[in-house]
Amino acid sequence: MAKQIWKPGNMLYPLPAVMVSTADKSGKSNIITVAWTGTVCTNPAMLYISVRPERYSYDLLKDSGEFVVNLTTEKLKKATDWCGVRSGRDVDKWKEMHLTAGRASKLDYAPIIEECPVNIECKVTEIKELGSHHMF
């Protein structure tokens, strides 16, 4: 079979969908569902999320420099999907999806989602402008 050459694109699927919670320094918080996330480095431990600058959560992330990657479950699939197609500019995702914002143990602003079994607390070390998305 001959090799096929495809134009550049996103070919690494499936990607994990996670709910990212963040807040600005005034306490305004939001949840954004992202699938562009992964490990960057083992030592020091680092991961990334990629977010479009026009997204509501982008300015919150940039202001506080904090976010939490919240791993989801089957039970949270509706909330995971819903938080990815609604904007925090228009709705309170915490209230609408009956999710609980909890206090992070190592962050000052970004809350954890209590209903998620794993909450990975993160501090932004760099914002890399890549094109359509910026990597935190």
Could you tell me what each predicted segment is?
Residues M1-V34, G38-F136:
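Active-site-proximal mixed secondary-structure blocks
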